[in-house]
């Protein structure tokens, strides 16, 4: 196998070398032949391709300067390709042209530059080698540009490889090689204060979104790599036969490199932004992390496209040929593609998404399809079409996988929606599809189909965390359960329908697309204390992690705690069974009530179910304010250290809660700790 790979690599290298040499030979032969008068104007390709003396001269040049038969054949076919739009020449045709010309070849003379040549000429070796050296410089720059373009792609390959290794070490072998000091200073803290999911407003007007230092460092290295790749290796010897001023050649090189680097990022941008990203399961990185990298790859790609466009425009204006460039088909489509990209980037900002997500989604999808079409027409005469087809392929792959998931889940299904009088939480139950494989952290998208709702609601899909599985819920053994908090849009419409229905229960037709979020299964034995801290509906995301971990071996020797922070005790009604299950698994469960008062009927009814069961009693602590998360984290770390057990915190809740809890964990990690502290954060913010 190793020998086969080596031979394959050698073949590819040899083939690339042959093709590069053939391109240089054919281009240089054409350039030196252009010094002489063959009775054709400089722009009349049809005249040259039908002129037997010109064809004989360039084929003779290729024969004289090719060092191998393979290089010769490739060079002859490169020459033939120059005439493919006028007349199709086969390799045999080109060889016959040379054989005929070899009977009449003569050395070129000075008069041949002004007087029409009547027979084929031998190559002007001085001119040929001059053009070869200059063309080699252009070719070398092109190769460097391709290396730089691939370098950006392989940067992300390296990032994903590192994430995959860490994920497998952790979940399969139970090894966490990340030191506490690295987590405290790099992985967990935000770039700016404790802002991560929340939006920071400068002067209360300008919105800024910050990420963690770890993800920020990855993006910073990516940006620096891009700048460095764009900045080196643009020099060329002067005088140059095509662009004599240095500025013109330098601008051409910068434009070409920016162009190739931007195009190489197209598949990265599209792959990181789709739902069916194949790297999510193996790397363990969340959809929100890939979405962050998707945005920054798009930003960098856009800036490279802007550099390419500005340089091309400035060069055209300075040379006085801008008007003629605008009349060219590929140039106009390049302008269209740049405009489309700028619109996509601008309207994708969080401030616009939050104001009207439906409008954002419609524009984003339409513009992406239009962008692919624009890039096709921009590049189909220039080359590099593989990158363009990759975008279309990734987009089609994602749509195909979505349709397949819906079909595998049974197509049109009926979901039961229910709630209580005083709750804005909707419980969605749907029969578990045969091929739906549940795994902790899994979520699914739902399309709600209703002729009475706005038409665009049926085209929207909303992600919900899947809570239950077949062998966990004895009351609904074949049901998938999801909890949804009604905010605005379709969820608010659904809540209104449920509340107005008898018994607050209604059936709804849906398409179920999933599961997503499935990753490498947790195989290693559990040797850590687990502390889950959820706020509000975040309990639905944290609970499945405890279900998975509490079923693993060696849990009896460890201490696990589950905190649920609520501002409405009526929430306990719809999550009572799950909390009782945790108690049965020897997990300490505490409900922290942050509301202003519990002296009401609803509150009494909410807690009554827990007080009746003495053996499975759940603590309800009424703080009437937000808990001190820093103190909670410090106390749990201290207890784990006394037991000499590593500890993992699971957290999920609103953006403010997640940021506060993340900051609390950062503050709680101390360099003197002898145990490993880890944070697993689930987020509703993408």
Swiss-Prot record:
Residues recorded as binding heme 2, renumbered to this chain, are: 308, 378
Q: Provide the activity regulation entry from the record.
A: Inhibited by nitric oxide (NO).
InterPro entries named among the record's database cross-references: FAD-bd_8, FAD-bd_FR_type, Fe3_Rdtase_TM_dom, Fe_red_NAD-bd_6, Ferric/Cupric_Reductase, FNR_nucleotide-bd
Instruction: Extract the GO molecular function terms from the UniProt entry.
Output: ferric-chelate reductase (NADPH) activity; ferric-chelate reductase activity; metal ion binding
- EC numbers listed for it are 1.16.1.9
Signal peptide per UniProt: 1-22
Q: Binding positions for heme 1?
A: 294, 364
Q: Which reaction does it catalyse?
A: 2 a Fe(II)-siderophore + NADP(+) + H(+) = 2 a Fe(III)-siderophore + NADPH
- SUPFAM superfamilies from the entry? Ferredoxin reductase-like, C-terminal NADP-linked domain
Q: Which residues lie on this side of the membrane: Cytoplasmic?
A: 170-215, 281-296, 350-358, 402-686
Q: Which GO terms describe its cellular component?
A: plasma membrane
Q: Specify the enzyme's EC class, one word.
A: oxidoreductase
Instruction: List the transmembrane segments.
Output: 149-169, 216-236, 260-280, 297-317, 329-349, 359-378, 384-401
Name the cofactor(s): FAD; heme
Q: Please list the residue ranges that the record places on the Extracellular side of the membrane.
A: 23-148, 237-259, 318-328, 379-383
Instruction: State the source organism's domain of life.
Output: Eukaryota
Industrial or biotech use: Responsible for the reduction of the azo bond of azo dyes, making yeasts efficient azo dye decolorizers.
Indicate which residues the UniProt annotation says bind NADP(+).
514-517, 652-653
Q: How does this protein lie in the membrane?
A: Multi-pass membrane protein
List the induction conditions.
Answer: Expression is repressed by the addition of iron. Induced by transcription factor MAC1 upon copper deprivation. Induced by transcription factor AFT1 upon iron deprivation.
**Consequence the record notes for mutating residue 294 to A:** Impairs heme binding
Q: Give binding positions for FAD.
A: 462-468
- Further comment found in the protein's record: Present with 892 molecules/cell in log phase SD medium.
Similarity comment: family membership: Belongs to the ferric reductase (FRE) family.
Function description: Metalloreductase responsible for reducing extracellular iron and copper prior to import. Catalyzes the reductive uptake of Fe(3+)-salts and Fe(3+) bound to catecholate or hydroxamate siderophores. Fe(3+) is reduced to Fe(2+), which then dissociates from the siderophore and can be imported by the high-affinity Fe(2+) transport complex in the plasma membrane. Also participates in Cu(2+) reduction and Cu(+) uptake.
- The name on file for this protein is Ferric/cupric reductase transmembrane component 1
Which species expresses this protein natively?
Saccharomyces cerevisiae (strain ATCC 204508 / S288c)
Q: What is the lineage of its organism?
A: Eukaryota, Fungi, Dikarya, Ascomycota, Saccharomycotina
């Amino acid at each position: 196998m190793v020998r086969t790979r080596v031979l394959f690599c050698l073949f590819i290298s040899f083939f690339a070398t042959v093709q590069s040499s053939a391109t240089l030979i054919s281009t240089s032969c054409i350039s030196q032949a252009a010094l002489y008068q063959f009775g054709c104007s400089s722009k009349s390709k049809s005249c040259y391709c039908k002129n037997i003396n010109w064809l004989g001269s360039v084929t003779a040049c290729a024969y004289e300067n090719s060092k191998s038969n393979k290089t010769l054949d490739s060079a002859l076919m490169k020459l033939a390709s120059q005439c493919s739009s006028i007349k199709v020449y086969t390799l045999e045709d080109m060889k016959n042209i040379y054989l005929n010309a070899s009977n009449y070849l003569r050395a070129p003379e000075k008069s041949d530059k002004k007087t029409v040549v009547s027979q084929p000429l031998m190559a002007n070796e001085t001119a040929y080698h001059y053009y070869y050296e200059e063309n080699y410089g252009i070719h070398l720059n092109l190769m460097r540009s391709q290396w730089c373009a691939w370098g950006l792609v392989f940067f992300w390959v390296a990032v994903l490889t590192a994430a995959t290794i860490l994920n497998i070490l952790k979940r399969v072998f139970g090894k966490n090689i990340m030191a506490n000091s690295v987590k405290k200073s790099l992985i967990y803290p935000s770039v700016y204060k404790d802002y991560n999911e929340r939006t920071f407003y400068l002067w209360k007007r300008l919105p800024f979104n910050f990420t963690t230092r770890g993800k920020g460092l990855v993006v910073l290295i990516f940006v620096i790599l891009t700048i460095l790749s764009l900045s080196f290796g643009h020099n060329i010897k002067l005088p140059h036969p095509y662009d004599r001023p240095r500025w013109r050649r330098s601008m051409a090189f910068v434009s070409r490199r920016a162009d190739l680097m931007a195009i190489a990022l197209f598949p990265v941008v599209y792959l990181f932004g789709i739902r069916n990203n194949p790297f999510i399961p193996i790397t363990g990185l969340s959809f929100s992390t890939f979405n962050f990298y998707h945005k920054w790859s798009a930003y960098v790609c856009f800036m490279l496209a802007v550099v390419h466009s500005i340089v091309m425009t400035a060069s055209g204006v300075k040379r006085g040929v801008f008007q003629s460039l605008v009349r060219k088909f590929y140039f106009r489509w390049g302008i269209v593609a740049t405009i489309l990209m700028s619109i996509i980037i601008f309207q994708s900002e969080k401030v616009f998404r939050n104001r009207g997500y439906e409008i954002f989604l419609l524009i984003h999808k339409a513009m992406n399809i239009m962008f692919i079409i624009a890039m096709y027409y921009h590049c189909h005469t220039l080359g590099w079409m593989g990158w363009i087809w990759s975008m279309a392929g990734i987009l089609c792959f994602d749509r195909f996988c979505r349709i397949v998931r819906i079909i595998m889940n049974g197509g049109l299904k009926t979901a039961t929606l229910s709630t209580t009088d005083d709750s804005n939480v909707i419980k969605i139950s749907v029969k578990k599809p045969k091929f739906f494989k549940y795994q902790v952290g899994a979520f699914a998208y739902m399309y709600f189909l209703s002729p009475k709702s706005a038409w665009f609601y049926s085209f929207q899909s909303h992600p919900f965390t899947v809570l239950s599985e077949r062998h966990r819920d004895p009351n609904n053994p074949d049901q998938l359960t999801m909890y949804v908090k009604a905010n605005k849009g379709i969820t608010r419409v659904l809540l209104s329908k449920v509340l107005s229905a008898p018994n607050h229960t209604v059936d709804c037709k849906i398409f179920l697309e999933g599961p997503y979020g499935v990753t490498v299964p947790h195989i290693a034995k559990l040797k850590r204390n687990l502390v889950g801290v959820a706020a509000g509906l975040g309990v639905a995301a944290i609970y499945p992690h405890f279900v998975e971990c509490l079923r693993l071996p060696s849990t009896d020797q460890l201490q696990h705690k589950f905190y649920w922070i609520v501002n409405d005790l009526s929430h306990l009604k719809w999550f009572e069974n799950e909390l009782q299950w945790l108690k049965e698994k020897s997990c300490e469960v505490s409900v922290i009530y942050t509301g202003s008062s519990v002296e009401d009927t609803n509150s009494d009814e909410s807690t009554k179910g827990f007080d009746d069961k003495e053996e499975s009693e759940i603590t309800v602590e009424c703080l009437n304010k937000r808990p001190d998360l820093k103190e909670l984290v410090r106390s749990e770390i201290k207890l784990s250290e006394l037991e000499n057990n590593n500890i993992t915190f699971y957290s999920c809740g609103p953006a403010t809660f997640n940021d506060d809890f993340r900051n609390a964990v950062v503050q709680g990690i101390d360099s003197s700790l002898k145990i490993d502290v880890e944070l697993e954060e689930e987020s509703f913010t993408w």
